């Protein structure tokens, strides 16, 4: 599993922010007595992908920094801090820093993202030379998406308000 992702320069990004207008501090909400929403997602990804390139991709906002640094250290995953509102720029900057051609988008509020779907999507994404790959065959909360760096760079120019991504 890991070899295919590595050979094709595909990284797994957990896209998350500590603050939310709808549910404040949702990333730190405890699922059980021991772990929070973000940790559950990391544990699921690490179980299937071992020490593969899993990155928490979040914003530079002050209350994000300490929270995610602690989790990154605890779980030995990279943490990338980028623009708060321009998520596409944050992702592009992270991909370029890590020398990736594609990334799997796993959102921080979808702790049940299906790791096996990631591999199937990745294979189809590469085989079909897609810029974007998704699935409708899974319930909400389980769906990963895959984007190419080339596709993001091409389409970022078409976005009217980059602060709403």
Feature map (PLM): residue ranges:
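N-terminal nucleotide-binding beta1-loop-alpha1 segment
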Residues: 1-24
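Structural beta-sheet core signal
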Residues: 12-14, 56, 105
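Short glycine-enriched, charge-decorated loop/helix-capping segments at active-site entrances
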Residues: 26-32
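Residues in the short beta-alpha loop(s) of Rossmann-like NAD(P)-binding domains
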Residues: 34, 41, 58-62
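A short, N-terminal amphipathic alpha-helix
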Residues: 36-54, 75
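Short phosphate-binding loop-to-helix
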Residues: 60-126
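Conserved core of the sugar-phosphate nucleotidyltransferase
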Residues: 113-165
